[in-house]
């Protein structure tokens, strides 16, 4: 075996190696300041002298600070342990249900809770690295060279505020930009009268909605005449829909937590500055997941703002599986053992379920994740084909009649209540089929003369008209109110017929037809897997009643087809 010298001083040091070791040494400066204290702890541990706990500084309440982890968006409660003013250890907060199950009662004394640690994932543990990273930005950096030149200099916070607000010749020292006059926020803060801004916005909305070119041009000229004293505040007076120059200020953020978001996005950007442009991370994260949840949670009800019955009340949220009570969990593009919302909360419950034999899990993910390594079955479907996988399962489940027919037959709230169900679906609601064969809107009782529109009065005293939906019972159309709590209505599931000359299909029929556009073999080919993979998961998924769930946060949504893929899985 050849000998390798450890004292080779002639080998050149690469830039990458230099930066890596420099970062290590920089971060080590903090650790070095605590080295003696850590050595003392180790020495006492080896000598078994750490007990009783009063001699162990990190187990004292005064050495601990309770906070929230922001290493990811879960926001687990944490307990930071401080030694001589430096954070040396982070554990889970025992008061938090995210990190300890069952969590300590809030009435527990901090002197007692100091001895109890919750769990925390490696991301949370790495909070120390984030806090003391030598490359952490703690000052404002200003570009000191051409764009892309990676040259920066630090400036004071006060100077940054002044330059951002007032603009000016901010890059006099950069070649080619000596005469570049940069606009500041004061230059973009053009339209300042809220009453005028509201009136202009309403007028611009009419222009935007008008599609006929001649009428549109006439509305633009009318707008310019009505607001002639304020045209200088617009981005382009000939295109009022672009809005005021205020809209040229864009607040583009990654993730902003509650409180900060309401202030920065709403109160400052929109309300105070008057810009409509506050934009988050959208589908690159999980925007499709949120907006599918919003679309699917919309209910037909009276809308207090618009003073009429409409689809309303949808929330930007998503569903996740009950890891503590399920018998079968299907994780699609999700790995709670290393990410997700969040390992401290979910990983322990899943692990207990697997160890106790209560739970079986399967994973659909192109990557063999930590979660997939513990799964009954891992299916490496191609990225972006998750919707095809869901439709393949849907086709098999409907054709094999392995769905909860009684639950799906509930057309309204009263029917669900009668069956002891907390929710109901639109599976049996009839949908009108257009002349081109495509589904249109839901059939209403007034469409077929079943009953007239119903005059109702809202809680705020507003009178409005409502129109009942329709389902089939024993082949006969029946009108119903989805929110009716007194008269239960159950409908037929798979419907493809005509009602008084109107071609209709049930919502479940349309779902089955969509899933039947391809054979299971064809769906599998799209995913790059076998048809048996789809069948095996569909069979297992339908073998546990209501104790089976699919968890799709968030890989399914992170594609351009994310909205529709999430829709397929939620269906």
Segments (PLM) and residue ranges:
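A glycine-rich, hydrophobic/aromatic-adjacent loop/helix-cap motif
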Residues: 243-245, 279-283, 503, 521, ...
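Conserved alpha/beta enzyme-core scaffolds, especially Rossmann-like or related mixed alpha/beta domains
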Residues: 151, 178-187, 498, 505, ...
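Short acidic (Asp/Glu) and glycine-rich catalytic loops that position anionic groups and cofactors
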Residues: 369-374, 513-518, 546-552
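Conserved thiamine diphosphate
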Residues: 322-325, 329-332, 511-527
């Amino acid at each position: 075996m050849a000998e390798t010298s450890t004292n080779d001083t002639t080998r050149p040091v690469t830039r990458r190696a230099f930066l890596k070791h420099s970062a290590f040494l920089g971060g080590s400066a903090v650790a070095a300041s605590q080295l003696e204290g850590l050595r003392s702890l180790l020495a006492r541990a080896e000598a078994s002298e750490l007990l009783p706990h009063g001699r162990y500084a990190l187990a004292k309440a005064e050495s601990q600070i309770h906070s929230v982890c922001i290493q990811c968006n879960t926001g687990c409660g944490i307990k930071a342990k401080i030694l001589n003013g430096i954070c040396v250890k982070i554990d889970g907060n025992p008061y938090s249900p995210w990190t300890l199950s069952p969590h300590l009662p809030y009435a527990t004394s901090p002197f007692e809770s100091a001895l109890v640690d919750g769990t925390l994932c490696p991301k949370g543990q790495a909070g120390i690295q984030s806090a003391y990273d030598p490359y952490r930005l703690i000052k404002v950096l200003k570009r000191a060279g051409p764009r892309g030149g990676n040259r920066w200099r630090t400036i004071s916070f006060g100077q940054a505020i002044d330059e951002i607000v007032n603009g000016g010749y901010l890059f006099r020292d950069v070649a080619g930009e000596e005469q570049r006059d940069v606009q500041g926020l004061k230059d973009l803060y053009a339209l300042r009268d809220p009453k005028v801004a509201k009136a202009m916005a309403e007028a611009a909305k009419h222009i935007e909605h008008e599609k006929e070119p001649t009428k549109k041009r006439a509305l633009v000229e009318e707008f310019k005449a009505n607001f002639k004293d304020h045209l200088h505040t617009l981005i382009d007076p000939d295109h009022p829909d672009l809005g005021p120059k205020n809209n040229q200020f864009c607040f583009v953020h990654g993730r902003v937590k509650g409180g900060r978001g309401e202030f920065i996005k709403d109160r400052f950007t929109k309300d105070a500055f008057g810009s409509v442009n506050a934009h988050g991370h959208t589908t690159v994260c999980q925007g499709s997941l949120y907006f599918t949840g919003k679309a699917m949670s919309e209910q037909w009800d009276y809308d207090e703002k618009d003073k009429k019955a409409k689809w309303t009340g949808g929330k930007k949220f998503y569903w996740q599986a009950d890891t503590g009570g399920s018998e079968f969990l299907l994780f699609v593009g999700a790995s709670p053992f290393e990410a997700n919302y969040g390992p401290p909360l979910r990983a322990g419950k899943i692990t207990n379920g697997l160890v106790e034999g209560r739970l079986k899990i399967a994973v659909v993910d192109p990557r063999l994740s930590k979660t997939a390594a513990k799964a009954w079955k891992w299916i490496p479907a191609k990225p972006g084909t998750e919707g095809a996988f869901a439709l393949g399962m849907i086709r098999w489940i409907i054709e094999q009649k392995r769905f909860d027919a009684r639950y799906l037959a509930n057309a309204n709230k009263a029917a669900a209540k009668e069956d002891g169900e907390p929710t109901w679906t639109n599976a049996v609601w009839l949908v009108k089929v257009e002349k081109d064969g495509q589904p249109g809107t839901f059939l209403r009782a007034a469409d077929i003369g079943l009953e007239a529109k119903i005059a109702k009065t809202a809680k705020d005293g507003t009178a409005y008209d409502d129109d009942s939906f329709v389902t089939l019972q024993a082949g006969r159309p029946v009108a119903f109110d989805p929110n009716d709590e007194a008269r239960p209505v159950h409908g037929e599931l798979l419907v493809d017929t005509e009602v008084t000359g109107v071609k209709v299909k049930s919502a479940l029929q349309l779902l089955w037809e969509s899933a039947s556009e391809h054979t299971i073999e064809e769906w599998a080919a799209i995913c790059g897997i076998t048809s048996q993979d789809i069948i095996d998961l569909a069979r297992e998924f339908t073998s546990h009643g209501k104790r089976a769930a699919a968890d799709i946060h968030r890989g399914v949504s992170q594609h351009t087809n994310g909205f529709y893929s999430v829709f397929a899985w939620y269906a």
